[in-house]
Regions:
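Glycan-recognition and catalytic cores of secretory/periplasmic carbohydrate-active enzymes
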Residues: 1-184
Length: 184
């Protein structure tokens, strides 16, 4: 039994959406159960573990996908339950993601998949294309907008706006098919 933070963050978001659409209480209960597992076993301060396997946290720090998917899921859960603690946890993880994964390279804003100094990687990849699942950058951008609009976090909103303008116009313009979640 392996728990991947990011995939479970997506599951939480999906379960909350199912509950909102159907008022099916077990969906919200399951979302809370999964979120509590992540909070209790995979979060340490502002660090989110990527993998929990057989009772042990396997990798101390997650990727942008993990932070974005879980951070956004916790914001969703806060709005669904009215429990401010979920919002605070989501905001804390998204704040950590700003520090770990956001960089500026030659005037271009980059959202990296891995944190700087990750000793497991030879190359530090960017997170900017959606595939079978949305990219961490897309979900991170949407969560930054939510923090800006709902909580009045002007820095989060400015970062999201800058990233969107940069990715959707000019020399770094991206393919719309590869960025459907970013455009949503």
């Amino acid at each position: 039994n392996k728990v991947l933070a990011g995939w479970n963050g997506l599951a939480i978001t999906g379960l909350v959406a199912a509950w909102r659409a159907s008022a099916h209480t077990p969906a919200l209960a399951l979302a809370l159960r999964v979120a509590k597992f992540i909070r209790d076993r995979m979060v340490n301060g502002d660090q989110l573990a990527r993998v929990h396997h057989e009772g042990t946290t396997k990798q101390l720090d997650g990727t942008l996908d993990d932070y974005a998917f879980c951070g956004a899921a916790f914001l969703e859960l806060a709005e669904a339950t009215g429990d401010r603690a979920w919002w605070d946890l989501g905001a804390r993880l998204l704040g950590a993601a700003r520090t770990k994964f956001v960089s500026e390279e030659d005037g271009v804003l980059v959202f990296y998949l891995a944190p700087a100094g990750d000793s497991l990687l030879v190359h530090r990849p960017e997170s900017h294309q959606d595939g079978a699942i949305p990219s961490g950058a897309s979900i991170f951008t949407a969560a930054l907008i939510r923090l800006g609009v709902v909580a009045g976090d002007a820095d989060a909103l400015a970062l999201a706006e800058r990233y969107l303008v940069q990715r959707l116009t000019g020399p770094t313009q991206v393919n719309a098919w590869a960025n459907s979640a970013l455009l949503a």
